[in-house]
Amino acid sequence: MEYRILAEFYERIEKTTSRIEMVSSLVELFKQTPKELIDKVVYLSIGKIAPEYTGLDYNFGEKLAIRALSRVLKIPALEIEKRVRQEGDLGEAGRKLYEELGFKPEGTLTVEEVYNGLLNIAKAVGIGSQERKISIFASLLKKATPLEAKYLLRTITERLRLGIGDNTILEALSIAFTGSSVNREVVERAYNLTSDLGYVAKILAEKGLEGVKQVKIQVGRPVRPMLAERMSSPILILRKLGGKCGAEYKYDGERIQAHRKGDEFYLFSRRLENITHQYPDLIEFLKEAIPHDFIVELEAVVIDPASGEIRPFQELMHRKVKYVTKYHITKYPVAGFLFDIIYLDGEDLTLKPYPERREILEKVVKRTDRIGLVPRKIVDNVEDLENFFYQAIEEGCEGLVCKSLAPNSIYQAGKRGFLWIKYKRDYKSVLADTLDLVVVGGFYGKGQRKGTFGSLLMACYDPESDMFKTVTKVGTGFTEDDFKKLEEILMPRKLNHRHPRVNSILEADMWFEPYLVLEITGAELTLSPVHTCGWGKVSPNRGIGLRFPRFTGRYRFDKRPEDATTEQEIIEMYRMQRKIRVRS
């Protein structure tokens, strides 16, 4: 299969502002793809060569790409850098240079060649690896047409800019190989259990829907985490959960999914990144505490060994290094508090109800001074829930996670729903909690910010439509250093038009690929004629907007755009806020 076909589809997708057209283009592409290549085409279409958890990265920045391009086009790197500044995009600059110089490709690029070349670049390490990477990439550029060069350059620098989401891929795969998006739920469950789009695509293409139904949990492949909705009223929480729930402490730590098979251990972050190397001590604690093959979920926190008290979340950031040494382990000792088990000795536990999973967890875990279970209390009245909430706050927690005890309280991998409800409270604001919102656009600033953005258009995520819907426009809370950092992150992801997965009434001065999640606070949620979050769901011809928004200073690099606060959460927060006003 020629790489040209992919490049042409990417160009078509980049130009559309319609998600329906994006899905349609992907369906057409997947139908044209040979079955043996479908996994590679899926990976390349999201700018990857493997799932996130493998840790395979190109480690090939723009400067290396320019060196390779300079070598192929036989022009100075400085000239290329100048064009990149003019175009604002290395890929587009490369395409135009190819055309202007009348570059003649030395052959025809295939998808296999591109994939294998990129894989070899990702695997190149050690002495001389940089030169090997440049040489491999240059060999691909030599065979590229102008359009192919554009997408090769974007791919290698991890700035593909198509913004194709997981749900969009899953929908397109379902239509392409089963004839209907109705089957997406089956395909999605297989993905939620394996976190590998390419793997699921290949099974679907080769073995059909029945093959996908046989996909099982595997130790070493992270399960996409179940997520909680949020509420700030104990009355509503109990009502939502049938009058009774299991309330658990919500620690301000790092959520980790731990896997064990014999002597093999894997630790995965909330974003499904392999972080095994960051916690060698935690692995030893788990080895002692659970003598079984397992997949468990826990919160890792830094503790004071003398008092057992939990230290601030920021101290955990010192573990985010390439090589964790004895110094890190001693200076920032961690403990793990387990809250779920989804696999035990070959058995998938995700379809068992929460009370049964908790009972299994209590039976198999040997408590130590570094491994424990998240404290839990079964509550059926507001007073008990409130008292347990205050107890959690006093012990340094963020609040509670209230869990359904019903027979249908299964582990919903990759889903956010009301089987789990976060109960947090911010007494300084009418707004019950901060929002994690995605940057989708920018507006020109004034004074020192003239010519670049001075405020950002922020959106929530709607998993039903796989769309980002606007909530607010924020320009306060940012320092000059923040603006510099934001420019570095956002400008390489600037688009010529609104992204097809962004639903916005407002016309931004510049648009960005949905990528960066920021923590935003504000005064209150109000009805809005210009924001699309909850449009028509709480009032005709109105959405929900956030008044007096402010950046808290927290960049949520641990969250993907699809992990942002959902539209439904904001609707619930708005309704809750109105009830509080009525009562007061």
Curated annotation (Swiss-Prot):
Q: Which cofactor does it need?
A: Mg(2+)
**Keyword terms, alphabetized:** ATP-binding, Cell cycle, Cell division, DNA damage, DNA recombination, DNA repair, DNA replication, Ligase, Magnesium, Metal-binding, Nucleotide-binding
Query: Alphabetically, which GO biological process terms does the record hold?
Result: cell division; DNA biosynthetic process; DNA recombination; DNA repair; lagging strand elongation
Q: Identify the SUPFAM superfamilies for this entry.
A: ATP-dependent DNA ligase DNA-binding domain (SSF117018), DNA ligase/mRNA capping enzyme, catalytic domain (SSF56091), Nucleic acid-binding proteins (SSF50249)
Q: Under which main EC class is this enzyme filed?
A: ligase
Recorded catalytic activity of this chain's protein: ATP + (deoxyribonucleotide)n-3'-hydroxyl + 5'-phospho-(deoxyribonucleotide)m = (deoxyribonucleotide)n+m + AMP + diphosphate
Alphabetized HAMAP family for the sequence: DNA_ligase
What's this protein's name? Probable DNA ligase
Give the source species.
Aquifex aeolicus (strain VF5)
